[in-house]
């Protein structure tokens, strides 16, 4: 049975690169895919082009779900009989030269492309973050709070360029929960929730030693350390010397300008804080880390869907998250922070570490179960198929 990548490679009929000075290939890459049989029309996808240029047997990158998403979105339209053109969301040179029935695009570059499409094209904005105004306000607020609390000023990596994708879209897709949805409700556009397709899954934590790991916690996230609350978590654990924090994320690469310098002592010279750096979620090392921890702590200030939290839940970790982390959590398997303060984080950490082994086991198993039931590639594909059916019905009405 062919993989998605192999299937798409079989049906690629034309691939060309446009080279421009100081422009990476994926900013101008173009892929044209044809279905088996007669085409029902054209679809334009503006998202991650890199996925379509993988070498034979090269795995889909697991550092973000968007690499698989791009392939699957194209594949769904192909299976339904459409011709699909794929460009990178950073492609600033592409001009639509044909009629498209449907346009799926991420927030970047959406407005420019939407203005160039035929009027009857149905335009879908794939929003993988909260609204940029909310996001940027939250990012600045966290940096301001850090300045007031510790006299440290850092630039946020998470500031997003303004965009008007929602204003030019007919439909909106999101990967998060009600929080993310609320930031777009002002538009009065139809909003469709897609479950995050976790990059990897893990076996049920049946052999986990909960007595041994009850005081070990994990912060796991991508760039934007202050935005995602790592500074708060670090300060909480400085006051909990008998509890341990493991940090997995691109600390040295982070562009929160000098986070690793400003927090060097805390990161690398504190007995109960263990900084790993970026971790491959498919590696035995990461599995060992999750097996040795009881919970993930993720007090993010704004997300489009907390993919790192979902990965941790798949590994059987109990989620301790902010509402803005945009992951549905209830008290049967996790805790939603109400204040995102150091004192609250300390209180919750002590509460979790003090629970009975059977309580911890039940919560961890439930987190794993919810992740397996909701956040899978199969469920993402099903939800996107349902969306396409709705768009097709809308297209028929518009004709």
Model-identified regions with their sequence ranges:
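Membrane-proximal helix-turn-helix segments that form the acceptor-binding/catalytic region
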Residues: 147-172
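Conserved donor-binding/catalytic core segment of Leloir-type glycosyltransferases
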Residues: 206-228, 232-240, 246
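Aromatic "clamp/platform" in nucleotide-sugar-dependent glycosyltransferases that forms part
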Residues: 301
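Acidic anion/phosphate-binding donor-loop and adjacent secondary structure
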Residues: 184-216
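Conserved acidic donor-binding segment of nucleotide-sugar-dependent glycosyltransferases
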Residues: 334-343, 351-357
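A charged, aromatic-enriched C-terminal amphipathic alpha-helix characteristic of glycosyltransferases
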Residues: 65, 357-389
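Short hydrophobic beta-strand element within catalytic cores of glycosyltransferases
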Residues: 317-322
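Nucleotide-activated donor-binding/catalytic signature segment of Leloir-type glycosyltransferases, i.e.
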Residues: 249, 258-281
């Amino acid at each position: 049975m062919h993989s998605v990548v192999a299937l798409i490679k079989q049906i690629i009929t034309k691939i060309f690169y446009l080279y421009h000075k100081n422009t990476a290939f994926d900013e101008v890459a173009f892929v044209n895919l044809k279905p088996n049989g007669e085409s029902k029309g054209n679809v334009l996808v503006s998202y991650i082009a890199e996925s379509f240029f993988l070498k034979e047997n090269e795995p889909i990158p697991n550092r973000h779900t968007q690499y698989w998403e791009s392939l699957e979105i194209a594949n769904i339209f192909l299976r339904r009989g459409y011709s699909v053109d794929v460009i990178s969301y950073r492609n600033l040179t592409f001009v639509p030269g044909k009629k498209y029935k449907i346009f799926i695009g991420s927030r970047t570059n959406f407005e420019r492309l939407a203005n160039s499409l035929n009027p009857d094209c149905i335009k879908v904005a794939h929003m993988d973050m909260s609204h940029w105004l909310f996001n940027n306000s939250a990012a600045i607020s966290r940096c301001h709070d850090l300045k007031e609390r510790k006299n440290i000023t850092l630039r946020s990596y998470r500031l997003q360029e303004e965009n008007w994708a929602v204003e030019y879209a007919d439909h909106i897709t999101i990967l998060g929960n009600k929080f993310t949805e609320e930031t777009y409700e002002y538009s009065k556009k139809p909003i469709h929730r897609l479950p995050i397709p976790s990059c990897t899954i893990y076996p049920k934590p049946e052999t986990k030693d909960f007595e041994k790991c009850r005081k070990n916690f994990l912060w796991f996230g991508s760039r934007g350390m202050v935005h995602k609350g790592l500074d708060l978590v670090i300060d909480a654990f400085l006051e909990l010397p008998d509890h341990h924090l493991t940090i997995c994320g691109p600390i040295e690469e982070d562009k929160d300008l000098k986070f690793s310098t400003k927090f060097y002592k805390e990161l690398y010279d504190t007995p109960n804080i263990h900084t790993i750096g970026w971790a491959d979620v498919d590696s035995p090392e990461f599995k060992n880390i999750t097996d040795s921890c009881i919970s993930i702590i993720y007090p993010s200030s704004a997300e489009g869907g907390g993919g790192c939290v979902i990965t941790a839940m798949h590994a059987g970790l109990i989620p301790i998250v902010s509402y803005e982390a945009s992951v549905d959590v209830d008290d049967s398997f996790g805790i939603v922070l109400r204040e995102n303060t150091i004192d609250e984080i300390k209180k919750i950490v002590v509460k979790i570490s003090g629970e009975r082994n059977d309580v911890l086991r039940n919560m961890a198993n439930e987190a794993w179960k919810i992740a397996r039931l909701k956040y899978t590639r199969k469920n993402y594909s099903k939800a996107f198929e349902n969306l396409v059916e709705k768009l097709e019905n809308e297209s028929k009405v518009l004709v």
